[in-house]
């Protein structure tokens, strides 16, 4: 049973004109509120999480939206409104959102990264245990990051018309990569 103080605390997240009319129990995943004399029901957010294993990619940037959707579409369809968070579990590749149509953009970004972060004999890096592409891969990964978040609307990722999720592979000889996808919403 929800106490008055718990009810007030829970109501903070709701518009101020709503008043709690009954409590949430463990078996009851909904809380009713009165709005102008009518009862409204607010759903408690759902959660889903899945690890997607991507096949090894050659060095460069690659559009992976279709690969991700193939593995998460059933879970994604359970949400009418929410957020999908994509987290790459690696330090020598990165995730970003960018152009999904013209492959020249993929190549141009790779060209920019290679011109910005030196490799080989001209590079000043100490961390070269796994080869000359090792430390540059870590730096490039830090530049873009290892995660992106995308709104979920009506069971679909709400990306812009020309947006797609990319993996940027910064190693010459990469292995499979794992992306943890966490979805929450109603």
State where each predicted segment sits.
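Active-site histidine-anchored catalytic micro-motif
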Residues: 2-186
């Amino acid at each position: 049973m929800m106490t008055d103080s718990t009810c007030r605390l829970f109501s903070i997240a709701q518009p101020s004109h709503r008043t709690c009319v009954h409590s949430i129990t463990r078996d009851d995943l909904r809380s009713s509120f009165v709005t102008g004399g009518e009862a409204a029901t607010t759903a408690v957010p759902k959660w889903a999480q899945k690890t997607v294993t991507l096949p090894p990619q050659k060095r460069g940037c690659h559009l992976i939206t279709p690969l991700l959707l193939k593995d998460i579409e059933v879970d994604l369809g359970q949400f009418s409104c929410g957020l999908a968070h994509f987290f790459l579990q690696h330090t020598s590749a990165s995730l970003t959102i960018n152009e999904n149509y013209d492959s020249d953009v993929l190549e141009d970004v790779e060209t920019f990264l290679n011109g910005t972060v030196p490799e080989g004999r001209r590079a000043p890096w100490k961390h070269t245990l796994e080869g000359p592409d090792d430390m540059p891969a870590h730096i490039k990964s830090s530049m873009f990051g290892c995660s992106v978040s995308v709104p979920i609307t009506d069971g679909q990722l709400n990306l812009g018309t020309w947006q797609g999720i990319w993996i940027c592979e910064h190693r010459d000889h990469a292995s499979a990569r794992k992306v943890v996808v966490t979805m929450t919403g109603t």
